């Protein structure tokens, strides 16, 4: 990208950032790139950019982009466009997720380069690149590279399981491991699969189908059944991990919030030589009836052990429809309010019990008000 006013990239070309009443204007020339790749079909990505900087007017004419308005936001928008252009030149296909995530990243730390953070592809499968789309996802992927056991904890839509499976496929393709093992607890059946009708495949398929679907997206669908038949890829309920030692394997445990503490301990102690484990889950979606979550407990038990990393993803890492992130935030706030009310009720009950013990008079026998 060339700046027709000879302003250094990222600088405010006109106006005064220290004077909020002044206006700034930046002129950017896009060379060697189709504008539709930068701005999106029907300028959808341009619309996303404008939402990030409401005090900036964006005008596009040919391959020229003009940004005008608040000096601080003009500078930020210019930096964002430059980063997006670099991604396009690197061969990356842009979506609204990259635009939003890049703007958020630059807003938190100007020293970050979204084109570097989001530019590293894990896999290219069926013409589609699988890569981190947020800073949190990028840090999660880096943690998988540098630790033997990684816990990816966060709400739905943060890519924690999908990215873990992509890293597993990458490790297999690079011959870093000999097999992939994907597992999750069949909590809806209480792991008592023998009581369900049909063959073993019929019984476990509904619980493991999301993992099969992801595999078919990442690999040749004709190759997946062969790898499954050969045992190179294994997809099984958590109960089938008991009593095994898993060497030379990349193991992914999904829906770990629905493991009991005993199941979590059993799973983690299956780790063998030259193996890697990724455990994913959302501690706000525990489906266990009247039982503690192994994922919730393990964050306290293993928090200070070397070579074990806890990656915590948030609503900012949700890469589904933008509304999903707002839904996650709303439920998080609701749960926090409910927990606060529960705590207040417990405190009030404890206070009443103390008062009762001091007075020696049970509350049931206190005189009633008339």
Residue ranges and their predicted role:
Residues 1-14:
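N-terminal acidic, proline/glycine-rich, low-complexity intrinsically disordered segments
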Residues 18-37:
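Short glycine-/aliphatic-rich beta-strand segments at the starts of folded cytosolic domains
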Residues 33-53:
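Short amphipathic alpha-helix segments
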Residues 51, 58-117:
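Interdomain "pre-motor" coupling segment immediately N-terminal to P-loop NTPase/helicase cores
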Residues 54-58, 310-311:
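A short linear hydrophobic-aromatic micro-motif
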Residues 68, 125-137, 146-253, 257-370:
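Conserved helicase motor core of SF1/SF2 NTP-dependent helicases
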Residues 108-132, 137-138:
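P-loop NTP-binding catalytic core
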């Amino acid at each position: 990208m060339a700046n027709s006013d000879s302003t250094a990239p990222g600088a405010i070309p006109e106006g005064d950032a220290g004077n909020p009443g002044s206006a700034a204007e930046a002129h950017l020339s896009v060379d060697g790139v189709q504008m539709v790749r930068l701005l999106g079909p029907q300028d959808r990505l341009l619309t996303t950019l404008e939402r990030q900087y409401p005090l900036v007017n964006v005008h596009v004419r040919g391959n020229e982009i003009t940004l005008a308005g608040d000096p601080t936001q003009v500078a930020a928008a210019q930096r964002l466009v430059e980063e997006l252009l670099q991604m396009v030149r690197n061969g990356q296909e842009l979506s609204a997720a990259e635009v939003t995530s890049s703007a958020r990243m630059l807003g938190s730390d100007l020293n970050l380069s979204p084109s570097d953070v989001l530019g590293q592809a894990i896999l290219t499968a069926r013409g589609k690149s699988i890569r981190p789309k947020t800073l949190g996802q990028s840090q999660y992927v880096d943690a998988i590279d540098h630790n033997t056991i990684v816990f990816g904890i966060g709400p739905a839509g943060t890519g924690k399981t999908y990215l873990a499976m992509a890293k597993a496929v990458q490790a297999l393709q690079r011959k870093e491991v000999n097999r992939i093992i994907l597992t999750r607890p069949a909590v809806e059946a209480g792991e008592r699969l023998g009581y369900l009708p049909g063959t073993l495949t019929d019984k476990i398929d509904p619980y493991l189908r999301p993992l099969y679907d992801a595999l078919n997206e990442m690999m040749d669908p004709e190759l997946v059944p062969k790898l499954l038949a050969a045992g190179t890829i294994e997809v099984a309920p958590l109960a089938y991990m008991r009593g095994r030692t898993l060497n030379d394997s990349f193991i992914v445990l999904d829906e770990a919030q629905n493991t009991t503490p005993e199941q979590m301990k059993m799973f983690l102690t299956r780790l063998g030589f030259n193996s890697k484990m990724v455990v994913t889950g959302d501690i706000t979606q525990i489906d266990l009836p009247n039982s503690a979550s192994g994922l919730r407990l393990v964050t306290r038990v293993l928090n200070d052990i070397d070579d074990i990393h806890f990656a915590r993803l948030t609503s900012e890492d949700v890469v589904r429809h933008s509304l999903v992130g707002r839904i996650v935030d709303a439920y998080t706030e609701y749960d926090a309010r409910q927990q606060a009310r529960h705590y207040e009720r417990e405190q009030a009950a404890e206070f009443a019990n103390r008062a009762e013990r001091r007075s020696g008079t049970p509350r049931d026998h206190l005189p009633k008000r008339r």
